[in-house]
Amino acid sequence: MKATFQVPSITCNHCVDKIEKFVGEIEGVSFIDVSVEKKSVVVEFDAPATQDLIKEALLDAGQEVV
């Protein structure tokens, strides 16, 4: 499964690193693409990962998800 999250609070590479760390810890996540320019995060994943778990990880990383 693939999901795109709009994350307007992404401003720098530190944000990218933190997002990759938090989302990458979720079992089932196979790909993460964070774009500072587009302020988006694209995640490819399989169970047990879910969109809700990914959104929670983004929030835990200090990001706003819309």
Swiss-Prot record:
Superkingdom: Bacteria
Domain HMA: from-to ranges: 1-66
Sorted UniProt keywords: Copper, Disulfide bond, Metal-binding
Effect of substituting A3V: In strain: A68, NCTC 11638 and NCTC 11639
Gene Ontology molecular function: copper ion binding
Pfam families tied to this protein: HMA
Transmembrane segments: none
Positions contributing to Cu cation binding: C12, C15
Role played: Part of a cation-transporting system which is associated with copper export out of the H.pylori cells.
Further details from the record: Copper (2+) binding can oxidyze the Cys residues at the metal-binding site, leading to the formation of a disulfide bond.
Protein's recorded name: COP-associated protein
Organism: Helicobacter pylori (strain ATCC 700392 / 26695) (Campylobacter pylori)
Lineage of the organism: Bacteria, Pseudomonadati, Campylobacterota, Epsilonproteobacteria, Campylobacterales
Gene field: copP
